[in-house]
Design a protein with these regions (language model features):
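A solvent-exposed interaction/effector surface
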Residues: 2-168
């Protein structure tokens, strides 16, 4: 390898490869069937482009902080399949797990999910990469195992790991 090729490799290829690895581009989804829940969460309901989820999450964070409610793990419930639902009609619940005794005021709502059997998909990747990897794996797993892909799914974000639950 010539010197210029080595410099190019070290200056461009290695950093780009490292960044892709850091973001989780090469991460695999892990899938299992488990019992999960129960959960209690405070959330807001939003409609539109899922790319706005970070902005909507900030609104929920502000509302919880204003009411001095301790936020737990961030959660999202996708209510509509983006493959079959027009962008303006896509609905999502965005929020945080909360304590059993937390009192939530409007505009937020309280959701409760009982303990149930789910297909659980875990992906350790950046928030930009993880959902695509998780849902692709979940849809493939469902098709391969004759399981109907159904919504809503429930997502939890813990320590850089996205966990997507689909009830069975």
């Amino acid at each position: 390898m010539r010197k210029s090729g080595l410099i190019f490799f070290l200056a461009f290829v290695v950093p780009i490869g490292f960044a892709l690895w850091w973001w989780g581009t090469f991460a695999d989804a892990r899938i299992e069937i488990v019992e999960r829940g129960p959960y209690r969460y405070a959330y807001g309901v939003y409609s539109g482009d899922y790319s706005k989820i970070p902005r909507w999450k900030a609104e929920v964070t502000q509302a919880l902080n204003a009411h001095k409610i301790t936020r737990g793990t961030p959660v999202t419930a996708l209510l509509d399949d983006p493959r079959m639902t027009a962008v303006p009609e896509r609905r999502v619940e965005i929020g945080y797990l909360i304590a059993a005794d937390a009192r939530v005021a409007a505009p937020l709502r309280v959701g409760e999910i009982p303990r149930r059997r789910v297909v659980l998909v875990r992906v350790e990747a950046s928030p930009l990469m993880a959902p695509g990897k998780a849902y692709a794996a979940l849809i493939e797993y469902a098709a391969t195992n004759n399981i109907v892909f159904r919504l809503p799914t429930f997502e939890l974000y813990r320590d850089g790991v996205l966990e997507v639950e689909m009830a069975l």
